[in-house]
Amino acid sequence: MGEDTDTRKINHSFLRDHSYVTEADIISTVEFNHTGELLATGDKGGRVVIFQREPESKNAPHSQGEYDVYSTFQSHEPEFDYLKSLEIEEKINKIKWLPQQNAAHSLLSTNDKTIKLWKITERDKRPEGYNLKDEEGKLKDLSTVTSLQVPVLKPMDLMVEVSPRRIFANGHTYHINSISVNSDCETYMSADDLRINLWHLAITDRSFNIVDIKPANMEDLTEVITASEFHPHHCNLFVYSSSKGSLRLCDMRAAALCDKHSKLFEEPEDPSNRSFFSEIISSVSDVKFSHSGRYMLTRDYLTVKVWDLNMEARPIETYQVHDYLRSKLCSLYENDCIFDKFECAWNGSDSVIMTGAYNNFFRMFDRNTKRDVTLEASRESSKPRAVLKPRRVCVGGKRRRDDISVDSLDFTKKILHTAWHPAENIIAIAATNNLYIFQDKVNSDMH
């Protein structure tokens, strides 16, 4: 499918670039909450930064998509496993928001080994006028208390407090690659290379192992778990992907240990395309259920695929993300780029999908019109409120003035982490150590 430069359906403008500096500031995950009012990022330094959407102003109607820093906190610290003599990085692998139950917000964050539940609350009033305590909280001399007064709440500057509520540790031998909150709002699962555990949000010292693909002899190991997610509506269903390119849909009602899947989604390999790199590039790096729950979106190295839950034999749609790299696989293997794990995302109506690429490019595919576009998230190409120009990669021969050659792509600039607002056409793109937020100029055009 060739790229279409007509972007009336996919037309985003740049809102803001939140810029960082050091290695520790490289963004490792991006996640909107269920309303889209909050956006959380995690970085390699173990920090979580939460952005809040600005309320729309009559004086500045363009500010409705603006996100400003709401709170920043240190989620994880570097640790050392003395039993295995291994350092445990503080890098945040995933963040997942819990559905909001009250005025407070809650999120889960995880590094390679430990998952933490955080509560985010606001305070804009403080109590004053205690009878037995002074303003600093110290007990008064009772002889000075001559009258009884009713304490009152006085307004104060807004204060955002983040507090750790639970720490879920010692559940994984291998590195955690994904966490997913169940639709029952009481449980969540965490997956590492070989096992998936089910946790209750209120219980930290016990989890149930629901998938275990570790062979008796590790020499017989042929695949690992790469990602997992709960179904958005059916709390008994979940899917996990593997390094062999397969998806397994499991039903927790069938058995306590879901080693026997309910459905296996796998595309037969085309023998004509078989090469040394076939298995590496077929490894699924991300899997996402559609909001409707009818479809699954997967990302492998060169493509994004849409699967229908009712059809296991092959995907119903396949989109080429950067097929021009097929001839470059040898050099991408040598510089380890072939092992990069790109994420993918649905828009709110499941009609457009998005994923990242190299050179700070990201791709969007409209499932209805079959249009696709390549856009760039970079300071050079993005000025606040400017409309993004579609980019085009040229493989050889004649090229237009704005085209970029495959040989001049920068493989150190990669967009691995993306997120889409659950209801509106606002997207968040993590480009190494910069966060870009884009908003559709013509709202509802893609819906």
Curated annotation (Swiss-Prot):
GO MF annotation terms: protein phosphatase regulator activity
Coiled-coil residues: none
Keyword Amino-acid biosynthesis: no
SUPFAM superfamilies assigned to the protein according to its UniProt record, in alphabetical order: WD40 repeat-like (SSF50978)
Keywords, ordered alphabetically: Repeat, WD repeat
WD repeats: 22-61, 87-128, 171-209, 220-260, 279-317, 334-375, 410-446
Taxonomic superkingdom: Eukaryota
InterPro entries: PP2A_PR55, PP2A_PR55_CS, WD40/YVTN_repeat-like_dom_sf, WD40_repeat_dom_sf, WD40_rpt
Entry's Gene Ontology cellular component terms: cytosol; protein phosphatase type 2A complex
Residue pairs linked by disulfide bridges in the UniProt entry: none
Family, similarity comment: Belongs to the phosphatase 2A regulatory subunit B family.
Quaternary organization: PP2A consists of a common heterodimeric core enzyme, composed of a 36 kDa catalytic subunit (subunit C) and a 65 kDa constant regulatory subunit (PR65 or subunit A), that associates with a variety of regulatory subunits. Proteins that associate with the core dimer include three families of regulatory subunits B (the R2/B/PR55/B55, R3/B''/PR72/PR130/PR59 and R5/B'/B56 families), the 48 kDa variable regulatory subunit, viral proteins, and cell signaling molecules. Interacts with IER5.
Task of the protein: The B regulatory subunit might modulate substrate selectivity and catalytic activity, and might also direct the localization of the catalytic enzyme to a particular subcellular compartment.
The protein's name in its UniProt record: Serine/threonine-protein phosphatase 2A 55 kDa regulatory subunit B gamma isoform
Origin organism lineage: Eukaryota, Metazoa, Chordata, Craniata, Vertebrata
